[in-house]
Amino acid sequence: MTRGSVSKQTRNNWLIDAAVFIGAVIAAITGIYFLFLPSGGYQGGRNPMYGVTILFDRHTWDNLHTWFSVLMIVAVIVHFAIHWNWVKGMAKRMVKSITGKGVRMNRYGIFNVAIDAAVAIGFLLAAISGVYFMFAGTGRAADPLFIFSRTTWDLIHTWSGVVMIIAAVIHFAIHWRWVTKVTAKVLPSLKPGLKPTGGTTVERAGA
């Protein structure tokens, strides 16, 4: 086994994480676009930014936001399925720590889990509200009033997305060294003709 080689498991984990990352980055950028360039209004109406084109037209931005969000959701589901045992173990450890039945986590551990929880909750709310808009429509379409009004769903989608982005940036910063270490090992294995080994599995810094 050559120095710096990685296992097939590590390579596959990295590819899934890369899909999550790419989907999240594009979804975040397009989401920020709509945060500052709201979609309501009409030509000559109350929205002075209506019809403004930045790189792409609004329809293209909307498609990018929708389908890269779908990519992120699918990749996250696969990610959680693969690391479900880790998630359950960490949840049990956290509960035992809070109830005093296990080893208390240090401040760094608690902060790390809190950030992970913020990412997960923000993602879940943004994903659910995003799926709502895929089927309920936007703009002048009739409001289906499913559980909440369209305005409430929009607020949930917007601010859960903001929370998710902030928490994800912090999460990424915390695990930056791990990310660069694994990426440096995985990228060479992606070259044509090179296959991952059955050996070294790089320990994850977290789910």
Q: What kind of region is each of these model predictions?
A:
Residues M1-A207:
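Membrane-embedded alpha-helical bundles that constitute the cytochrome b-like, heme-associated redox core
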